[in-house]
């Protein structure tokens, strides 16, 4: 397990604590709810610190793009936790129709319901937008990864082509060297042939001269 994975494990532990505390918020009221909310907010701050640490670790990691996508998702999760805390603060302790304005006139009750409804709608819109942005980021990250893989493949192919070119240059040099050697051998053979012809002619001349001298005697 590397440093990123250990940090991620600590982050997940804090997220589990956040989820548990948020579920308990509607059961509290008054000062207890304020204390519970502060505890959740402290956990959220701690989770954000872990995310920041993971972002730094991801920059130099071999799987940088994959890990950066993870941290984006974790940021989105934290935003959802924050909205859930806001919603929980509006919910009643018994999760029914009671709320801080339950004994108030109808216009206050209606105002409370409208605010809660708007907050729920806004939360749903933010969740939907966050999901779309995350999917877009994932597609972008995948495209970037594919592009990097293609560049790596092209780089390897380029190295292979350069290696083949170098070998061709070496082969061409060897052919030129062999050609020079063969040309030298051919010249030596031609020279030797001329010398041999001259020697033969000289021998024939000497033999003819000896025969002539014998006839003259």
Curated annotation (Swiss-Prot):
V-SNARE that mediates vesicle transport pathways through interactions with t-SNAREs on the target membrane. These interactions are proposed to mediate aspects of the specificity of vesicle trafficking and to promote fusion of the lipid bilayers. The gene is vti1A. This is Vesicle transport through interaction with t-SNAREs homolog 1A. The keyword Protein transport applies. CDD domains: SNARE_Vti1b (cd15890). It comes from the Eukaryota. The chain crosses the membrane at residues 193-213. GO terms for molecular function: SNAP receptor activity; SNARE binding. Residues 90-109 are annotated as: Disordered. The lineage of its organism: Eukaryota, Amoebozoa, Evosea, Eumycetozoa, Dictyostelia. One of its GO terms (biological process) is intracellular protein transport. InterPro entries: SNARE, T_SNARE_dom, v-SNARE_N_sf, Vesicle_trsprt_v-SNARE_N. It is found in: Membrane; Cytoplasmic vesicle, Secretory vesicle membrane; Cytoplasmic vesicle, Clathrin-coated vesicle membrane; Endosome membrane. It is a single-pass type IV membrane protein. Residues 214-217 are vesicular. Belongs to the VTI1 family. GO terms for cellular component: clathrin-coated vesicle membrane; contractile vacuole; endoplasmic reticulum membrane; endosome; endosome membrane; ER to Golgi transport vesicle membrane; Golgi apparatus; late endosome membrane. Residues 123-185 form the t-SNARE coiled-coil homology domain. The keyword Iron does not apply. It holds the Pfam family V-SNARE. Component of the SNARE complex composed of syn7A, syn8A, vamp7A and vti1A.
């Amino acid at each position: 397990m590397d440093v990123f994975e250990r940090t991620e494990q600590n982050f997940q532990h804090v997220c589990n604590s956040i989820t548990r505390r948020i579920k308990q918020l509607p059961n509290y009221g008054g000062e207890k709810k304020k204390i519970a909310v502060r505890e959740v907010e402290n956990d959220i701050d701690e989770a954000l610190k872990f995310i920041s640490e993971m972002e730094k670790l991801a920059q130099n990691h071999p799987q940088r793009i994959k890990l950066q996508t993870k941290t984006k998702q974790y940021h989105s999760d934290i935003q959802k936790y924050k909205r859930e805390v806001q919603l929980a603060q509006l919910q009643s302790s018994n999760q029914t129709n009671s709320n801080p304005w339950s004994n108030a006139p109808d216009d206050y009750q209606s105002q409370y319901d409208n605010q809660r409804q708007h907050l729920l709608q806004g939360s749903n819109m933010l969740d939907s937008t966050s999901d779309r942005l995350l999917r877009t980021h994932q597609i972008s990250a995948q495209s970037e990864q594919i592009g990097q893989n293609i560049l790596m493949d092209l780089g390897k192919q380029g190295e292979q082509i350069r290696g083949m070119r170098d070998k061709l240059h070496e082969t061409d040099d060897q052919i030129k060297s062999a050609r020079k050697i063969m040309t030298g051998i051919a010249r030596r053979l031609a020279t030797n042939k001329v010398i041999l012809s001259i020697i033969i002619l000289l021998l024939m001349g000497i033999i003819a001269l000896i025969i002539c001298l014998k006839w003259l005697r």
